[in-house]
Amino acid sequence: MPVLITENTSIDHDVQGEGPPLLLINGLGFGRWGWFKQIPAFARHFETITFDIRGELGLRNGVADLTGEVVALLDHLGVGKTHVLGTSLGGFVAQELALGRPDLVDRLVLACTSYGGRGPEAMSPGALADMMGLGTFSAEAAARKALEAATGEVYRAEKPEEFEQIVRWRLADSPSVVSYLEQAKAGARFDLSGDVGHITSPTLVIHGAEDRYVPPANARALAEAIPGAKLRLLEDAGHLVFVERFADVNREVVTFLRPRKLRKRTARPADEAEAEGAQLRSRG
């Protein structure tokens, strides 16, 4: 459903499930479809809000402009405070939101992301070339190259059909070239290295041990910089850790966001097992 923010700006979004609100902020090149492993699990416990990151009109103020759109969306939905999960570029937006509008952020989950700037370890030139699809001659080849670099070998070997489905989704529902480049430029300029320590929301950092786009050293530095933050580093996963190790990610997130007493009262079979293939069946 599109939300009219200004005369020229709208945001496509979905709200699913009931419970405390949980805002999911996707990364570069992904739309709401990228949460196909999370929605079945999270909607059991949370009013889960997903939306498509924009950028067509330019991001003069970088990630701050994307954060402004998030605030407008929450205002439209009447959400006064929400848990927030951001992946990659979405993690940048989540950090900006937690710093600039701490009144809106309850608990914070940052996955496959960093605090920007130089950081402890930069993306290698080869990984950057793969992400941008350099050396390819079609949109499909570029998407495949980027997604291969974003996932670990174990995942691609065990779930080749699912990987191919993600490639198809990426091609069918990806940002415009202008939006993609604006988002990429905003991410390149992002730097909260001197401010991230002021985040006050309880924070969980999740990362894949084989992430080529955001090397794991960045996750360790991020968790160390945010007071009291917890770190979960998952093996056999790359940048798309929330897809590759979805069961573990979902379990960690639900456990972190839900009070212990509430978890005991509403204990149910593992949500994560039901997420396997559910969205693939409905979309395939």
Regions flagged by a language model, labelled:
Residues 119-120, 140-195:
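Conserved alpha/beta-hydrolase catalytic His-Asp/Glu region
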Residues 40, 49-85, 251:
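Active-site loop/oxyanion-hole signature of alpha/beta-hydrolase fold enzymes
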Residues 99, 106-137:
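Flexible "cap/lid" loop of the alpha/beta hydrolase fold
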Residues 199, 205-207, 211:
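Short beta-strand/loop motif that positions the catalytic acidic residue
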Residues 6-58:
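Conserved HGGG/HGGXW glycine-rich cap/lid loop of the alpha/beta-hydrolase fold
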